[in-house]
Amino acid sequence: IGYMLQEADLMLLNDSVREELLWNNKTMTEKELDILLHKLHVYHYRDDFPLALSKGQRLRVVLGALLSRRDNELLLLDEPTTGQDQKSLENLSMLLSYAAEQGKTIFFCTHDIELASSLADRIFVLAQGHFVAVGAPHEIFSNKEVLRMGGLSIPPMLELSEYLGIDPCITVKEVMRHVL
C-alpha cells in the first residue's frame, strides 16, 4: 500500500530527486529510473534537492516514488490536487491514469469534482464519517441532494446544463458536446 499525505512535502526525505525515487525501491534500474523521471517531467532535476522544486514537481516526485514500487497495488492519496495549477493537474491526471492502467487501485480524497469525474470509476460520498452515496461519477455528481448531504458544491456545469435545458453535465467538455 502506498500512501501520500495531503502535505506531500513532509514525505520528501532525501537530498536529490534521484535518491527520493530510489530510496524505497532499491531494485529499480537506471533505465527504469530515467523513464520514470521523464514521465514525471523532472528528468532535468534528478540531482536537485526535492524541496527546491515547484509544488507541482514535488507532488509528482512523491507520487512517482509511490508508483515506482511494484508492490504498491493500492494507492491512498489525500487531497493530491491541493495547491496545483492547471498544468500540474493535467500531469497528475496522466500519472493517475497511468497507474490505473498498470493495475493499481487508487483511492483518493478530493473536493475536485471535475477531476474525480474524469478519473474515478466509483465515487464514495462521506458525511459525518458515514457513506451517504456510492455510485458512478455522473450518477453521484448530477444528484444535488447527494452533493448537499456530502457538503460538496454543486458543479457549475450542472447548473448551466439545467439552465440550457440539456442533459445533466458535470464538465465543460460535456456541455460543449451539447452546445456545439
Annotate each PLM feature:
Residues Q86-S88:
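Helix N-cap at the start of a conserved alpha-helix in ABC-type nucleotide-binding domains
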Residues E30-Y45, L67:
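Conserved ABC ATPase "signature" region
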Residues T110-H111:
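H-loop/switch region of ABC-family ATPase nucleotide-binding domains
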Residues L75-D78:
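Catalytic Walker B motif of ABC-type/P-loop ATPase nucleotide-binding domains
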Residues A116-S118:
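A short, surface-exposed alpha-helical micro-motif characterized by mixed small hydrophobic
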Residues H130-M157:
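Conserved beta-strand-loop-alpha-helix hinge in the C-terminal portion
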